[in-house]
Amino acid sequence: MTDLPFTLDQLRILKAIASEGSFKKAAESLYISQPAVSLQIQNLEKQLNIPIFDRANRKAVFTEEGDTLLRYGNRVLSLCDETCRAIEDLKTLQGGTLIIGASQTTGTYLMPRLIGLFRHKYPQIAVQLQVHSTRRVAWSVANGQVNLAVVGGKVPDELRSKLQITPYVDDELALILPKLHPFSKLEVIQKEDLYRLRFITLDKQSTIRRVIDTVLNEHGIDSARFKIEMELNSVEAIKNAVQSGLGAAFVSISAIAKELELGLLHWVKIEGVVIKRTLSIITNPSRYQAKASEIFSKEILTLFVTPYEI
């Protein structure tokens, strides 16, 4: 076998430059000098006999050849990481890291409790939780950057054929009110009562907002007629606003378990209407599945009955 015209260190430098946007920042992230980075790139261009960067541009702009090298180089590095994880697994779970992805609400309110159960049983395994949008998490699974993910949104169409998407559990979205609201004395309200409320919501592009609007419309409730007091960008902000008496809101039951237990919020049901969304587990069948990932799925995720019962 002939020697390769590049090294893993050179590929890592390329990846760092692409990520950081400059030779200087790449050098800092790798804890090496900038001249060392420049020298490695010069050697790589000489070995491959191609220009990797556009020298006419002051910024680190890849040429077409450089883009191709970066794309395949990232695949090589990803496979190397996968190889290391597989070898680490052979040590019978005596260590290693499990990387889990989750969408915003799921990652904030559900996964920490489940990870706690896992860490209690397997303290020798480190766990990383990456919380992002469903789309970003799905791409991380596809690229092998996370072992598995639990999401509440729709996986991008372009990834659905590459990933295994398993329905996990239904997550109910509850209508919450301030404790002093007149409806807080009721257990159930009627559909028409919704038009009398002032709502605090997530923005229209959020997955939860779309689920709520769709289900309400299916039950003959025109959410476009709701009085929207304000739109906020986090569930925590919405809960605080409701507690302050600013309005009502729909949020995941998993996000209000503590507040309901302490009597800080009131959950009122709507006659004949239940709003649910399905949480899904996503994995990449074409990637190596770590033993820790399998154990988390079989022993921990199966313990989950409903978000409110954890």
UniProtKB/Swiss-Prot annotation:
It is found in: Plastid, Chloroplast. One of its GO terms (molecular function) is transcription cis-regulatory region binding. Transmembrane segments: none annotated. Residues 23-42 bind DNA. GO terms for cellular component: chloroplast. Coiled coil: none annotated. Residues 6-63 form the HTH lysR-type domain. The keyword Phosphoprotein does not apply. Pfam families: HTH_1, LysR_substrate. Trans-acting transcriptional regulator of RuBisCO genes (rbcL and rbcS) expression. This is Probable RuBisCO transcriptional regulator. It comes from Guillardia theta.
